[in-house]
């Protein structure tokens, strides 16, 4: 399945004869019409590049008389003059059968293509050594607006070139998900094969395009289709060695024991292609041993560990035990032994959780992707409430009634808003009900020149409202996406942002009240008969030994006050600007870099200073779905580094270091959603949605008017200074969760 076409960047890998499948000839819908070198994405294709001899011959033709050059550069008036003078027709062909429409298509000259079609150009004319159509030429350059125009004008997507490739195969080889979405909605059979029996899914797997593999499988492609050599998509994925592709195929039921005509299983192919590590890792991810058989646990817990619902409850409740064990050890053992014993116990219990994660569902293989962190907070909240009800309240209810009343109120509010933020739909953009609806949306976006990653989500197949973002963790687009918060194991978006802010605000106040109550409680307890301490003085020893468990728990709560205070401050500032965390990251990335602000906001919002870990890439858009990337590189982080990020320790150093490098403060770009501090705050706190109860999905206020973020596709016309978000259409400098 090799390709000699450098312009499509096809990967040549291994001896294909050993796989029982000969590689197809050079992929290219244009034959010699393909430049021998990869041109820049915005570079036009020169005539001399296609055929140097003919290019030299054309050098003597005046530009005004050269129909092919005029088509290439898109000079519609010059083309009109040639037609008016009857020197050429729209269906003029050179000696290889190439038409002006071919040249206009490959150079992305939309106006010229439209003019030629209006002038009667044959949309299905074949030319070049590979006998390809203009649509095929455009597809290999990823000009999907040109492809859409040609399809509208009658281009046949099932036509093939001399090598048997249709436009779907060529688009897959190029690797653009948006072009593939367009073509699949043309009702092209998803499993249409080339001359050697390769389906589009096989090409996507071989090229290492996980986004396209996922798209084909969701569209119904056969995961166990075979080519002439008996190779399945799984075999081809292992030829490339793309772990995401292999994982996705196994997820959709690819046969792990399928044999080629030469009797080679995927395991054998992996060995021949030196991708055995990828194969073994993929098997382990889905609970299979090295032979591809389901793992059998000696303890008989395999079925329990694989149950996502059960494991979700385990990861949420397990930190309850960890918090209790840590506090109990620190409060009941001598300090010299307590600290190391506590560390050993905590790391041991966390190792149990990590071991369960490694054996559990594939999406839980990373502990931070489980409800574990939300369980840490819930466990802390539970033990604070337990200690308060059974120990603090009985002693202080008569001496501090107001303080107890306030704490009870804020503790209840914190619990309510925490649970609501965790279980509430954060603002998932509704999915479309049918492919016909998807096709209608795509057509509308093409008409508006908005069919791109900014306005359409390939994963959800929906039009993206303004301020929305696709969350990889939730696998959905979220309206007015703020961030994905591991402490509530949910996204924060249009529906639960206010509840989330109320949760952290009530938590902030509740912690302060609990600390005061704790000191009142300790002072009310009788002094121990014979206090004995080795480090602290007698007075402090007398105070600590009255109820060490409650004091240690109080210290743990105070630690949480650090990141809670930072988060509340960030959210309040962003509310005053009518700005989300996502927009804050994004606005600062467009030639206006504030490293300290990005590190700070990312850490307090999502538990890490890494924009990638926060789901906020340097442009804020996430991975570019238009570019079907290969396997991502994963950086390994130790336990201490992970926890330092989660507790905000590395944020302090990042803020201090980057703050020294920040240049003079530039003028902040205008925020199209800001209506001034007072109006922004009023819109957020006083919208019609109930504080206690479910709001209408996506409903909010902007400038005093009720809007719905699920259906807001146009930028508000009114512009005010403030905020840090300017453009809703910026290019992602990354590749492209």
UniProtKB/Swiss-Prot annotation:
- ANK repeats span 96-125, 130-159, 163-192, 196-225, 228-258
* Gene Ontology cellular-component annotations: early endosome membrane; Golgi membrane
- Where does the chain cross the membrane? 314-334, 335-355, 375-395, 402-422, 499-519, 549-569
Organism for this UniProt entry: Aspergillus oryzae (strain ATCC 42149 / RIB 40)
Which PROSITE patterns does this entry report, sorted A to Z? ANK_REP_REGION, ANK_REPEAT, DHHC
Query: Could you name the active-site residues?
Result: 485 (s-palmitoyl cysteine intermediate)
Alphabetized GO MF terms: protein-cysteine S-palmitoyltransferase activity
Q: Please report the stretch or stretches of sequence annotated as the DHHC domain.
A: 455-505
Q: So which stretches are on the Lumenal side?
A: 396-401, 520-548
Spans within the Cytoplasmic topological domain: 1-313, 356-374, 423-498, 570-737
Q: How does it sit in the membrane?
A: Multi-pass membrane protein
The similarity comment for this entry is: Belongs to the DHHC palmitoyltransferase family. AKR/ZDHHC17 subfamily.
In this chain, the stretch annotated as Disordered covers 1-39
- Protein's recorded name: Palmitoyltransferase akr1
